[in-house]
């Protein structure tokens, strides 16, 4: 692929990432939409560099089968949305800007107050259909990664065969 095509493809990807903010804002109450509108964005290619740093922190094993065993002190698994919501809403973060990544197609990274995310987690997570939602410190010193997988927990199976995982560090 020549450089011109690569540049056009990159610009298209960035425009899609930026337009996701408008789409997200249309689903949120006015006060939440204003907060999203006012925050800065990180788009490709910097977005990929940030996500790669998170993967590197976990030796590129974050979504591997044995991650829960190898890093059990950093990960909790749940069968139900309300369990994840309770867990995340109990999380205490420093009162500062963080990276917010939504695991939906064409999501940029939002630069936003971490406590705002915790306070609004329930509604925000619902708006992205309980998809992945990552809260990451700018220096990668702490983070909360909410992920969704197919499967079930033997002790509390979800009939929809969904497992929610919360991976935390530095908190």
UniProtKB/Swiss-Prot annotation:
Tree of life domain: Bacteria
Protein name as it appears in the record: SPbeta prophage-derived uncharacterized protein YokC
The species this protein was found in: Bacillus subtilis (strain 168)
């Amino acid at each position: 692929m020549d450089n011109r095509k690569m540049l056009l493809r990159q610009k298209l990807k960035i425009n899609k990432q930026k337009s996701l903010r408008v789409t997200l804002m249309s689903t949120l109450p006015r006060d939440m939409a204003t907060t999203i509108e006012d925050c800065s964005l990180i788009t490709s290619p910097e977005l990929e560099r940030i996500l790669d740093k998170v993967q590197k922190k976990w030796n590129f094993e974050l979504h591997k089968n044995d991650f829960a065993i190898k890093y059990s002190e950093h990960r909790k698994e749940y069968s139900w949305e309300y369990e994840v919501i309770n867990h995340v809403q109990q999380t205490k973060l420093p009162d500062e800007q963080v990276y917010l990544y939504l695991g939906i197609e064409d999501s940029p990274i939002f630069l936003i107050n971490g406590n705002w995310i915790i306070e609004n987690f329930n509604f925000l997570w619902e708006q992205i259909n309980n998809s992945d939602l990552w809260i990451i410190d700018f220096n990668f010193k702490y983070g909360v990664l909410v992920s969704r997988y197919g499967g079930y927990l033997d002790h509390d199976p979800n009939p929809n065969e969904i497992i929610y995982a919360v991976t935390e560090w530095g908190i």
